[in-house]
Amino acid sequence: MSDEIDMVLLEAAEKMDKAIEVAREDFATIRTGRANPAMFSKILVDYYGTATPINQLASFQTPEARMILISPYDKGAMSSIEKALRESDLGINPTTDGQIIRVVLPQLTEERRKEYIKVARTKAEDSRISIRNIRRHAKDSLDRLHKDGDAGEDDIRRAEKQLDELTHKHVEHVDEILKHKEAELLEV
């Protein structure tokens, strides 16, 4: 196979790996019954007029399965962090003692678990669509190589087969992550 075909396949693989990484990050923000600092990663705090990710303003500790302690680096940001946590869609009620913010995660109701599973399935489908779009763009590039005469038909067919296998592998990976997240959510 030609170098151009290898480049198309390599680029597609890298983009699909990135799509998997984004899916992992998205799944980490979905709350389960356990305390996980990653669930706060998408929360932005109004820090002196600038929207700043909370993980840049504080450190997180999980002393218990359903409790997170948040220690702001700048105590002046305490009220802004607390406000951002209250306004988030996580359904939490933070308390503060002046030094740290304590977040006790309430037990998830069955209804809330099902809601989160729907969110997880939507995120998984978005990831699958992203991976399929990457495949489509790579296939278009392969077709262009064939049309321009840079690669023979047999090489293109082999490359398309590899691309399909790559796509299938990445979609299965997303399904695996989803299955794991659903099991985590259903755990009482």
Describe every region a protein language model picked out.
Residues 3, 101-188:
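Positively charged, low-complexity, intrinsically disordered RNA-binding extensions
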Residues 37, 47-64, 95-100, 107, ...:
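Flexible hinge/switch segments at interdomain interfaces of large molecular machines
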Residues 69-103:
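Helix-adjacent hinge/juxtasegments
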Residues 32, 90, 147:
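Short, conserved catalytic or interaction motifs in soluble domains
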Residues 1-79:
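A positional/architectural concept
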Residues 25, 83-91, 122-126, 136:
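Short, intrinsically disordered, mixed-charge
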Residues 33-35, 96, 133, 137:
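Alpha-helix N-cap and coil->helix boundary residues
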Residues 64, 74, 89, 105-109, ...:
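Generic hydrophobic/packing signal
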